[in-house]
Amino acid sequence: MIEELDLHGERHADVDRLVENFVLLNKPPMAIICGNSSIMVKLVTDVLERHNIEWERWNYGTIKIL
């Protein structure tokens, strides 16, 4: 089963903490749903890159960690 973090309705200021906690407390595979916001996608990928986590963009607005 894939763990999912849905960021719809979350504030940009909270994304760093939410994504960091999610990726550090769960094991792959995981999905992070960012929606249509390019800012949200950038915030998420910044956290993943900071932690050297490999990710793929499967659909616009969804990032997968395998």
Where does each model-flagged region fall?
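Long, charged, low-complexity intrinsically disordered regions
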Residues: M1-L66
